[in-house]
Design a protein with these regions (language model features):
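Hydrophobic, well-ordered secondary-structure segments
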Residues: 2, 17-20, 54-77
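Secretory-pathway/luminal and periplasmic proteins that interact with or process carbohydrate-rich
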Residues: 81-83, 94-101, 150-158
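Short, functionally critical alpha-helical segments immediately adjacent to catalytic or ligand/cofactor-binding
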Residues: 69-94
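Non-catalytic cell-wall polysaccharide-engagement segments
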Residues: 2-28, 112-184
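An acidic, Gly/Ser/Thr/Pro-rich helix-cap/linker signature
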Residues: 19-49, 167
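Peptidoglycan-targeting cell-wall enzymes and recognition modules
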Residues: 37, 41-57, 87-139
Length: 184
């Protein structure tokens, strides 16, 4: 009985304290049809780039496939286009398949004669070198980098070709994501 009196007292008290509100304001916002469009955060963007790199490197049967995380962390650290380094490796060594044995140098860095302990060390060293010796000195485009990096006049157009391979793969993934958009 005491519990019943306490419950009734609480209900009566709440009824007197409660403030009236306009239900149409609340229902107006809650009744709208929402389209779920996630804000592309850095994590999502880099997860997509990781997938793109993995798919392209897998297609070329590249030994660099296990170094996708190094490509990504290097592009973030040195503020590079994430597809630049793998594209250079694509041109210079067919994505790491044609290198001096044991050199771990897929970029042709130092005319391909510089030896690295690992692919990851090569990726970081070349990324840092591009940032410090090319980009920080005014070479901002692939063409400007190419005029310093390589003696071939077609180097930049061939790097651009490989960068486009990665970008087209990213477009395919974007299409898949758009087709699977959720409407609430």
């Amino acid at each position: 009985m005491k519990n019943l009196i306490k419950i009734l007292s609480a209900i009566i008290l709440l009824l007197f304290i409660a403030h009236p509100i306009k239900a149409e304001v609340i229902s107006d916002d809650s009744a709208r049809m929402l389209t779920f469009q996630p804000k592309i955060s850095d994590n999502i963007r880099f997860a997509k780039k990781k997938l793109v790199m993995s798919r392209v490197l897998n297609r070329y049967d590249s030994p660099l496939l296990r170094s996708v995380d190094s490509f990504l962390s290097t592009c973030v650290l040195y503020e590079l286009d994430c597809y630049l380094l793998p594209s250079i490796a694509g041109l210079e060594s067919t994505f790491g398949k044609q290198v001096l044995y044991g050199s771990n140098n897929p970029f042709g860095w130092g005319n391909g004669l510089i030896l690295f302990e690992s692919w990851d060390q090569a990726i970081d060293t070349v990324g840092k070198g591009l940032k410090e010796n090319y980009i920080n000195k005014g070479a901002e485009s692939v063409e400007q980098i190419g005029s310093i990096y390589a003696t071939s006049k077609t180097w930049s157009s061939r790097i651009t070709y490989f960068m486009n391979v990665f970008e087209k793969e990213e477009e395919k993934i974007d299409l898949i994501l758009e087709q699977n958009q959720v409407n609430l």
